[in-house]
C-alpha cells in the first residue's frame, strides 16, 4: 500500500533539526540537487525588491551562533525549545552555527532568542 502525502508530511514534521538536516543531505545526494541555489536566488530577489520584501517576511529561522561559556544551560534551553534529546541538543550547541527552529513566527523567534540568550548563548534570527 502506498504512503499518502499526509503521512509523509506528518513524519517529516516530527523529525528533529538534526534528522531534517540529514534528510536534506540524503535528498541532495540521491537526486543530485542542492538547496543552496534557492537561498541565493531569494537573496538576489530580496536585494532587488528593497524594503518591501523584508516587510513581508513572516517566517523566521532561529540560529545558534555560539553556545557561550555556560553550555549546560544552553543545552537545557535548546532541549526545551526544540524537543531534541540530550545528545542531539549537545551536538547542536557544539556544531555552531546551528539552525534550531525554521519557519517560526517573529514572536516565537524572539521568545526563543530571549531564552537562549538568558542561558548564555549568542543567537541570530534570520
From Swiss-Prot:
InterPro entries given for it?
Ribosomal_bL12, Ribosomal_bL12_C, Ribosomal_bL12_C/ClpS-like, Ribosomal_bL12_oligo, Ribosomal_bL12_oligo_N_sf
User: Which Pfam family, giving just one, matches this sequence?
Assistant: Ribosomal_L12
Domain of life of the organism encoding this protein: Bacteria
Q: Name one GO biological process term.
A: translation
Q: Name one GO cellular component term.
A: cytosolic large ribosomal subunit
Going by the UniProt record, its keywords in alphabetical order are: Ribonucleoprotein, Ribosomal protein
What are the recorded GO MF terms, alphabetically?
A: mRNA binding; structural constituent of ribosome
Subunit structure as annotated in this protein's UniProt entry: Homodimer. Part of the ribosomal stalk of the 50S ribosomal subunit. Forms a multimeric L10(L12)X complex, where L10 forms an elongated spine to which 2 to 4 L12 dimers bind in a sequential fashion. Binds GTP-bound translation factors.
- What the protein does? Forms part of the ribosomal stalk which helps the ribosome interact with GTP-bound translation factors. Is thus essential for accurate translation.
Family, per the entry? Belongs to the bacterial ribosomal protein bL12 family.
This protein's name: Large ribosomal subunit protein bL12
Species source reads Helicobacter hepaticus (strain ATCC 51449 / 3B1)
The opening ranks of the lineage are: Bacteria, Pseudomonadati, Campylobacterota, Epsilonproteobacteria, Campylobacterales
State the encoding gene: rplL
